[in-house]
Amino acid sequence: MDPSAWAICCLLGSLLFHVGIPSPGPSPSVPRLRLSYRDLLSTNRSAIFLGPRGSLDLQVMYLDEYRDRLFLGSRDALYSLRLDQAWPDPREVLWLPQPGQKVECVRKGKDPLTECANFVRVLQPHNRTHLLACGTGAFQPICTFITVGHRGEHVLRLDASSVENGRGRCPHEPSRPFASTFVGGELYTGLTADFLGREAMIFRSGGPRPALRSDSDQSLLHEPRFVMAARIPDNSDRDDDKVYFFFSETVPSPDGGPGHVTISRVGRVCVNDAGGQRVLVNKWSTFLKARLVCSVPGPGGAETHFDQLEDVFLLWPKAGKSLEVYALFSTVSAVFQGFAVCVYHMVDIWEVFNGPFAHRDGPQHQWGPYGGKVPFPRPGVCPSKMTAQPGRPFGSTKDYPDEVLQFVRDHPLMFQPVRPRRGRPVLVKTHLAQRLRQIVVDRVEAEDGTYDVIFLGTDSGSVLKVIALQGGGLTEPEEVVLEELQVFKVPTPITEMEISVKRQTLYVGSPLGVARLQLHQCETYGSACAECCLARDPYCAWDGTACARYRPSSGKRRFRRQDIRHGNPAVQCLGQGQSQNKAASGLMTRVFGTEHNSTFLECLPKSPQAAVRWFLQRPGDKGTDQVKTDERVVQTAQGLLFRRLSRHDAGNYTCTTLEHGFSQTVVRFALEVIAAVQLDSLFLRESRLEEPSAWGSLASASPKTWYKDILQLTGFANLPRVDEYCERVWCRGVGERSGSFRGKGKQAKGKSWAGLELGKKMKSRVLAEHNRTPREVEAT
């Protein structure tokens, strides 16, 4: 059967199924480019490692750029992957629970598949040849050292004889949130250290000094959910270094009311903390915490708070600048689901910790600033050169007076909260189909400034690439979603993300596996200057011939075209290879439609962020008018749908897009409307000349309502009937008669009744009817 004839017969059904929903206006939060799992693989932008058994059960990921290795901790195994290759030679070491641990775990009521295994949750660098690894050990945590060799060697070995108890260094459960970092040969962890998951603490172990832990007082930690831990120096004095913990707490209502609320915190301890001599023995004597606020200001002073901390990324600066903390938050409200990204300067965090302490007289009282005398040395400070005074040396926290230790025990909370830069989030996402789980940031130098590119991992296996424009007269940050990348084939939550600026690569981890993803692929945006400029990707610029990687030190400076802030190709791309686009926009596709029938004109812009507009030039008119839509003429996301075509709809249609003030033509159609009377006459004449048959009598019984029959037949359950109806009544006959679907009026995608040159074919068809081959007999 002629493909054009089949497309004509089944067009109406596909229209009803696929284009019946009106198109909403473009949203600034819609990704400008969406790339599927297949797209990423076919363009070599990503590579996937699923392990030898098809699924990793990944728990932790450690990127070691010194050794050019990526280390993975999973269920009962560890892996080493080389960064300079597409995972061709992975190394695996099995690490099963100790004998009897799994049996005991099952006996205690835990799940043998999802809990009673050794889930590796800690991978930290110990020295130049070894990593410290800790696993859940079937609810009996264990730790050991892993030999990884020197730089250039691809070695991965586990010494089973060195396995030791990991309690306090690794949680019992594979799903329990926790954070860890390795500083000076010691492991700092924030976790719940008991079997039942109730004993929350911050723990230090593994070095020559005695282990240190949080006091059991509930005022320190209330059901914490640890997210991240890192050593952050306050100044050049190494004795003043601190380890910062980022976490959320569920605490009693701060105003003394009933119920509990979730609050995000930043806490810190001194690296040289040794505990107290008589008070807080073997306990933290420098622990302080402050609230992290991420909220959107509203009318009347009301604020919408994002209180659940999801992930934290530290953006280390160049010399002379302050460290910036990017934090991803979510709402805890049952009313709506929202996410926000707030940015904090470390200098602002330091100011809060140097400010007033919080105090209240009782559980039913509100918090206020402490107004009494603060002892010396100031509670929470590290013993260092800054605290030493003549005649009163404090070389260790054990030398601190008891009143200092008692004060820090009673007042661990700071009164002032830490507020984000500019007082509001740089990015807010609400009513998403997926949850945001991970965040990493890359600071990129572009032609018109420096931009922070934010990569957000979701719980559906995709990564959003976003920039937030600030300043330049903007009262609020402008969100620009550059790409949505479907990294994994099936939906799976992204639980780990690491970025290599040196390799311009993002490493994405999920329970399914690990993906290596290039940060950019500029040629994907298109082959024209306007398309490259409209992408607004700081990584990419038009170099005069193609959309290519922007390099600040490139010698082709005068040829580069890039406008991240405004995305205006009208200025940037003047005379830069737009002739090809103009030639394409001048092409006119001829489309035929039948009066009172449905017809569809397809227009698919490259950018979902562009506003689509349709213009009509009627026969005899010199100017064009914008198409007015109503119940009969509907503009959808795929094009323009005429539900019931009229003779007045004939004319030249132009589909244009408008994006950042730049308009361009996508496609043009010349729509010709065939009168219903003319088509009815054709069917009536054919039915009289045909041999009698059941299908022939059906066609001639109601020649004026044939299109209504097709509409009634459309539907998934009736597709075989549509096929048979088209085949026997119309499609095969038309395909065999005089090549009436051949010629210059060819069927375009989604166009009905293309190629019916009725005026030219009518006479020849009538003269040749007596020589026509019967429909049910093949020609010889």
From Swiss-Prot:
Domain Sema: 32-519
One Pfam family from the record: Sema
Main location: secreted
Recorded GO MF terms: semaphorin receptor binding; signaling receptor binding
Domain of life: Eukaryota
UniProt note on tissues of expression: Highly expressed in lung and kidney. Weakly expressed in brain.
Signal peptide: 1-22
One Gene Ontology biological process: negative regulation of axon extension
Bridged cysteine pairs (disulfide): 105-116, 134-143, 270-382, 294-342, 522-540, 603-655
UniProt keyword Transmembrane present: no
Gene Ontology CC: one annotated term: extracellular region
Compartments reported by the entry: Secreted
SMART domains referenced in this protein's UniProt entry, alphabetically: PSI, Sema
Gene3D superfamilies found in the cross-reference section: Immunoglobulins (2.60.40.10), ligand-binding face of the semaphorins, domain 2 (3.30.1680.10), YVTN repeat-like/Quinoprotein amine dehydrogenase (2.130.10.10)
Keyword Secreted among record annotations: yes
Domain Ig-like C2-type: 569-671
Glycosylation sites: 44, 127, 652
Keywords: Disulfide bond, Glycoprotein, Immunoglobulin domain, Secreted, Signal
Purpose: Has chemorepulsive activities for sympathetic axons. Ligand of NRP2.
Family listed: Belongs to the semaphorin family.
Protein name stated in the entry: Semaphorin-3G
Annotated organism of origin: Mus musculus
Annotated gene: Sema3g
